[in-house]
Amino acid sequence: MRILGIETSCDETAAAIVERDGQGEGRILSNVVLSQIAEHEPYGGVVPEIAARAHVEALDRLVARALEDADMKLADVDAVAATAGPGLIGGLIVGLMTAKALAMAAQKPFYAVNHLEGHALTARLTDGLPFPYLLLLVSGGHTQMVLIRGIGDYERLGTTIDDALGEAFDKTAKLLGLPYPGGPAVERMALQGNPKRFALPRPLKGEARLDFSFSGLKTAVRQTATELVPLSDQDVADICASFQAAVADTLSDRVGRSLERFRNEFPDCETPALVVAGGVAANKTLRAALETLCARHGFSFIAPPLDLCTDNAAMIAWAGAERAATEAPDSLDLAPRSRWPLDEKSAPLIGTGRRGAKA
């Protein structure tokens, strides 16, 4: 089965073709991603209207290129899958309407994919990972620990009660006058800094709950920077290094408790694994801390290649293929959802907004 996938939930426009065989093994035939960093950089963050217009301008040619790279025509695909949420509503509409039109024109089944499910299942595409396993999703919009039991069977163990980790990186960068995107900029500066100079907080460390919190850490960065004005380059580097060290300690504590929870629930699991996905998973310091943690607990550490950690359409095509193996297609009347929790059974946390839980 060969699936055309489309991803337009935020600031990457993407199209891909993925093949899933009868044994459930996957192969990427093409994967095309166009970043909008240049469009959003002057504003220091993603502007939804600009993002939606950029998707409109680029998506048709990216779909054509994905088909060309896979040496296929639209008639050759077996189904079309697209991100239906969560994300920026304008971008979701562009991708979803395009996918529906292609599915209708080619008379192919259509599958609406939860963007978070795409991240959740990527390790099955890249590593053939069996169920169950743990997922740590760390990105600009999400920070979650999710227990992956099977297709459509997800339990959110913990989530951020305020800022997502990627957002904390971006806001820290902005406070310190670093360029957008903030995550890579903070990581680069941290290489030149002293991680022990500033004693920044480790939010929720030691608590039994499995949730995350990063707003207090971000506030501590602001207070530290304000006290040092004017900031030298070394001050900025030391703040970045101290911030990154605090994040690594916090993640190790929070994730470590989730690993223990997994062991208690699945004592006979022979292949316990932690999968890390999302753009923040590219941070080498955080990856090293999590690898050390997994080794200590006897878990495999799995981080898909960077181009599959960040937003892409191969993961959407793969999630569509996984669902197509056992489920009926979705209706072409299906609407996009700006907020779409991966685990819809979990109650939204206080502070998730009047519109409901985003994830």
From Swiss-Prot:
Its cofactor is Fe(2+). Residues 328-359 are annotated as: Disordered. It is found in: Cytoplasm. It comes from the Bacteria. The keyword Metal-binding applies. Fe cation binds at residues 115, 119, 311. GO terms for molecular function: iron ion binding; N(6)-L-threonylcarbamoyladenine synthase activity. Substrate binds at residues 137-141, 170, 183, 283. InterPro entries: ATPase_NBD (IPR043129), Gcp-like_dom (IPR000905), KAE1/TsaD (IPR017861), TsaD (IPR022450). It catalyses: L-threonylcarbamoyladenylate + adenosine(37) in tRNA = N(6)-L-threonylcarbamoyladenosine(37) in tRNA + AMP + H(+). Required for the formation of a threonylcarbamoyl group on adenosine at position 37 (t(6)A37) in tRNAs that read codons beginning with adenine. Is involved in the transfer of the threonylcarbamoyl moiety of threonylcarbamoyl-AMP (TC-AMP) to the N6 group of A37, together with TsaE and TsaB. TsaD likely plays a direct catalytic role in this reaction. This is tRNA N6-adenosine threonylcarbamoyltransferase. The gene is tsaD.
